[in-house]
């Protein structure tokens, strides 16, 4: 059975990665390196699809910044993972050739074609960075508001009664 999860998240404290925990006990890790547009997501999707079609249970690790994109896959029976090793979840080989193999997709870029769009690429990279900064500020602000509301609620809301109400509602919903 295939599984779909996020192995990182965007939080009020910035990007939080759980890749280290996920990769700790995996026998073989292929780390994809390369900038935007080098085919990391496409390669991950194709390999994941092929593994699934062959009946291999596959864990799909989705990107917290773009939930339509993959940041990695884990093929359980083979105990191998293929991951995007670029920011914000930078992954580098700690045991090259023993446990990890770095795949430099950037080596296959047609640099002449990319240079034609260099101004656009630079502008979009700056915009992306600015949007992430704004998003993290918004998440931090939301956290402060939530904490302030919790402080206000303290002593007003009876948590045990709220828990009983939630349990009662869940019971009635299940019976309906």
Report residues per predicted region:
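Small-side-chain structural scaffolding
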Residues: 44-48, 81, 135-142
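Conserved nucleotide-sensing/catalytic segment adjacent to the nucleotide-binding pocket
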Residues: 3-12, 49-121, 126
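Short, low-complexity cationic-aromatic patches
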Residues: 23, 38-40, 76
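Generic local-structure boundary detector
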Residues: 17, 41-43, 69-72, 84-86, ...
């Amino acid at each position: 059975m295939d599984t779909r999860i996020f192995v990182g998240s965007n939080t009020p404290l910035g990007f939080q990665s759980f890749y280290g925990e996920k990769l700790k006990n995996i026998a073989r890790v292929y780390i994809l390196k390369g900038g935007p547009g080098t085919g990391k997501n496409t390669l991950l999707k194709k390999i994941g699809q092929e593994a699934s079609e062959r009946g291999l249970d596959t864990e799909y690790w989705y990107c917290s910044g773009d939930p339509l994109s993959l940041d990695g896959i884990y093929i359980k029976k083979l105990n191998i993972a293929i991951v995007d090793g670029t920011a914000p979840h930078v992954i580098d080989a700690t045991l090259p050739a023993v446990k990890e193999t770095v795949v430099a997709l950037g080596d296959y870029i047609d640099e002449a074609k990319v240079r034609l769009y260099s101004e656009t690429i630079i502008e979009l990279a700056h915009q992306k960075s600015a949007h992430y900064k704004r998003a993290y500020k918004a998440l931090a602000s939301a956290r402060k508001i939530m904490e302030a509301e919790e402080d206000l609620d303290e002593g007003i809301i009876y948590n045990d009664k709220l828990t009983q109400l939630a349990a009662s509602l869940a019971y009635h919903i299940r019976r309906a």
